[in-house]
């Protein structure tokens, strides 16, 4: 099943980028711990690295730049100059080295945003998260850059999690 998920993800993402005519597709990933590769004992098993390896097997000039960092929310990837966000418990700052402004400065063909749950975990309302996504997407579109927003996925596709599992929820 894990190979099926990875194959499907790769197929969909490659299909989205097949129309690029430039030699070498340039993709930037913005995200949190899953995209950064947390939870894997071998960084080559992180989904971004597997995706990079796959794309480069098709064309060695394809690049995938990973700007993800564990714990990040959509607040961290907002444009440079965006005011910090106050959750009521702490202030979330924009990271100018890992945000949409930095991503666009790399002249990508596409940006993948992988931010599964940290906004909710930090008490950021869904409406605010959606507003952040809209701002980021609008900036990318204005630059002619495609954006894909991914959902949650396993941290890796090659290691089994060691439980605990209920009887009806066993790994493949």
Language-model region placement:
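Bacterial N-terminal signal peptides that target proteins for export
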Residues: 1-9
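Bacterial N-terminal signal peptides
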Residues: 8-16
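Bacterial Sec-dependent signal peptides at the C-terminal "C-region" and cleavage site
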Residues: 16-24
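Surface-exposed amphipathic alpha-helices with a cationic face
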Residues: 137-141
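Conserved SGNH/GDSL esterase-like catalytic core that processes O-acyl groups on lipids
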Residues: 24-29, 34-131
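A short helix->loop->beta-strand "cap" motif at the edges of active sites that frequently abuts
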Residues: 143-146
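Substrate-gating cap/lid alpha-helix
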Residues: 155-172
């Amino acid at each position: 099943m894990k190979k099926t998920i990875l194959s499907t993800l790769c197929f969909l993402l490659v299909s989205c980028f097949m129309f690029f005519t430039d030699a070498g597709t340039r993709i930037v990933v913005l995200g949190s711990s899953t995209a950064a590769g947390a939870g894997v004992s071998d960084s080559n098993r992180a989904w971004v690295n597997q995706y990079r390896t796959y794309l480069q097997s098709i064309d060695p000039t394809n690049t995938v730049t990973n700007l993800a960092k564990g714990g990040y929310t959509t607040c961290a990837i907002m444009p440079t100059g965006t005011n910090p966000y106050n959750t009521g418990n702490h202030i979330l700052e924009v990271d100018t080295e890992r945000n949409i402004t930095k991503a666009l400065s790399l002249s990508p063909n596409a940006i993948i945003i992988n931010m599964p749950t940290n906004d909710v975990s930090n008490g950021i309302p869904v409406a605010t998260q959606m507003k952040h996504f809209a701002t980021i997407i609008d900036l990318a579109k204005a630059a002619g850059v495609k954006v894909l927003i991914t959902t949650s996925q396993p941290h890796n596709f090659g290691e089994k999690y060691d439980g605990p599992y209920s009887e009806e929820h066993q790994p493949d």
